[in-house]
């Protein structure tokens, strides 16, 4: 499939940018948080990266209209890195399902108390918000990692608008 972009120097549309980023495969995460009323919120996210090792910090980019972002602004959030069998969770948390947490098994993490999708995530990071900044229609949230849970499993990937599974050589 050939994707054509505007000529250099021309205005880049949201569709152009989305098509470009679809060519960059990445892992799939579900960002979780609990609002002031104790209600869990979550959304599928592929805009996640490590920032620094000292202190251990990562960033996520969340849509400003997201209910999950509102809960994250409470000061803590969880990052659930989905394993190869976590596609259903990725789909549930990327749609307008009313009770997303009723569709998956989850529990409160030990240190931060954030929702951990224990059956769908091969890794979990509990984070404390250190800084956030608005850029366009998204907010970049920097979280200092205070908790890590890991299991050995193959990650779920997303690229070219499709889910895939890592298949290591060897």
Swiss-Prot record:
Q: Name one Pfam family in it.
A: Flavin_Reduct
Q: Which SMART domains match?
A: Flavin_Reduct (SM00903)
**What top-level branch of life does the organism fall under?**
Bacteria
Organism equals Lentzea aerocolonigenes (Lechevalieria aerocolonigenes)
The record's section on Gene3D superfamilies has:
Electron Transport, Fmn-binding Protein, Chain A
What is the protein's given name?
Flavin reductase (NADPH)
What's the catalysed reaction? reduced riboflavin + NADP(+) = riboflavin + NADPH + 2 H(+)
Q: Name one GO molecular function term.
A: riboflavin reductase (NADPH) activity
Q: What is its EC number?
A: 1.5.1.30
The cross-references to InterPro entries, in alphabetical order and at most eight, read: Flavin_Rdtase-like_dom (IPR002563), NADH-dep_flavin_reductase (IPR050268), Split_barrel_FMN-bd (IPR012349)
């Amino acid at each position: 499939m050939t994707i054509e972009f505007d000529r250099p120097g021309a205005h880049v549309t949201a569709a152009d940018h989305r098509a470009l980023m679809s060519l960059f495969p990445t892992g799939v995460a579900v960002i979780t948080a609990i609002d002031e009323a104790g209600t869990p919120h979550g959304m599928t996210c592929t805009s996640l990266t490590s920032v620094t090792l000292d202190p251990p910090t990562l960033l996520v980019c969340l849509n400003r209209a997201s209910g999950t972002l509102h809960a994250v602004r409470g000061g803590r959030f969880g990052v659930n890195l989905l394993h190869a069998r976590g596609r259903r969770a990725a789909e549930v948390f990327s749609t307008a399902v009313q009770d997303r947490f009723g569709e998956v098994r989850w529990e409160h993490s030990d240190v931060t108390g954030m929702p951990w999708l224990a059956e769908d995530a091969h890794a979990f990071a509990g984070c404390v918000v250190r800084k956030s900044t608005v850029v366009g229609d998204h907010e970049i949230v920097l979280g200092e990692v205070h908790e890590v849970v890991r299991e050995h499993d193959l990650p779920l990937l997303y690229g070219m608008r499709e889910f895939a599974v890592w298949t290591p050589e060897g």
